[in-house]
């Protein structure tokens, strides 16, 4: 039960770091595919 209680404090920074990383990666792939640069 201790692990279950500590789950939100583990997932909040994980989501806060992983979601922007996925967003930036998909954005950079989208830019490379469209060849804006």
From Swiss-Prot:
**Keywords, comma-separated and alphabetical:** Chloroplast, Membrane, Photosynthesis, Photosystem I, Plastid, Thylakoid, Transmembrane, Transmembrane helix
Query: Which InterPro entries is this protein grouped with?
Result: PSI_PsaI, PSI_PsaI_sf
Its localization reads:
Plastid, Chloroplast thylakoid membrane
Q: Name one GO biological process term.
A: photosynthesis
One GO CC term on file: photosystem I
Q: Which SUPFAM superfamilies match?
A: Subunit VIII of photosystem I reaction centre, PsaI (SSF81540)
- TM spans (from-to): 7-27
Query: Is Hydrolase set as a keyword in this record?
Result: no
Thylakoid found in the keyword field: yes
Q: Which domain of life is it from?
A: Eukaryota
Entries under HAMAP family matching the protein: PSI_PsaI (MF_00431)
Family statement: Belongs to the PsaI family.
Its name, as the record gives it, is Photosystem I reaction center subunit VIII
State the organism named in the record: Eucalyptus globulus subsp. globulus
């Amino acid at each position: 039960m201790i692990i279950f209680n500590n789950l939100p404090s583990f997932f909040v920074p994980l989501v806060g770091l992983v979601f922007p990383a996925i967003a930036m990666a998909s954005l950079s792939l989208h830019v490379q595919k469209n060849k804006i640069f």
